[in-house]
């Protein structure tokens, strides 16, 4: 595990089928350039929660385009459980999930540009409108609220959940995480290791 890509070369990084980003993204220029090259050449990425956080101070247009969403807009606080609804069962990441489930407590991020409005994005799960208003200190009152999606131009999945340990203990959510990991790895240009 690492919190930076400094010290890695592209030849080293391309040997990995997937980068799992738990609540962080590359912040220094060297790491950003390496991550861009890795993803533009078929790399895989599974991002959780704050790994997608970006605001006007992030200054990384490529990453915003890669994520398929705009800058951070709002969040609920404190973390709370939420009803999530599956957008499609046609995608391998959601094929065996229930139509809806209650996710463990998390802080959910909402974006200035909705991922669903991006032609390159396929939304897989959405926070149900039944949750509104959501929060106590910081309140989200409504709006379209995708929480899991893929940018179809890349081998990537973003998962909004992951604010604390509880996010990783729910059976339905564990299945979502496992499906996402397997889907990304199975599409590796080097071949599907699960077929061996």
Question: Can you name each region flagged by the protein language model?
Answer:
Residues 4-6, 24-27, 129-130:
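Short beta->alpha connector loops
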Residues 130-147, 151-196:
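Extracellular ligand-binding/catalytic regions of CAZymes and related secreted enzymes
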């Amino acid at each position: 595990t690492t919190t930076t890509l400094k010290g890695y070369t592209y030849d080293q990084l391309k040997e990995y089928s997937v980068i799992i980003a738990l609540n962080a993204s590359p912040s220094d220029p060297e790491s950003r350039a390496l991550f861009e090259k890795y993803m533009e050449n078929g790399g895989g990425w599974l991002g959780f929660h704050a790994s997608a956080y970006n605001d006007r101070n992030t200054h990384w247009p490529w990453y915003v385009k890669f994520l398929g969403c705009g800058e951070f807009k709002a969040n609920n606080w404190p973390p709370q459980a939420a009803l999530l609804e599956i957008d499609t069962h046609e995608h391998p990441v959601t094929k065996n999930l229930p139509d809806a489930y209650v996710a463990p407590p998390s802080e959910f991020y909402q974006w200035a540009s909705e991922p669903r409005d991006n032609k390159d994005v396929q939304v897989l799960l959405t926070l149900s409108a039944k949750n509104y208003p959501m929060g106590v200190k910081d309140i989200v009152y409504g709006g379209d609220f995708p929480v899991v999606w893929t940018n179809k131009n890349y081998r990537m999945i973003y998962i909004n959940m992951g604010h604390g340990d509880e996010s990783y203990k729910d059976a339905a959510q564990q299945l979502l995480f496992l499906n996402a990991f397997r889907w990304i790895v199975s599409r590796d240009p080097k071949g599907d290791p699960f077929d061996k």
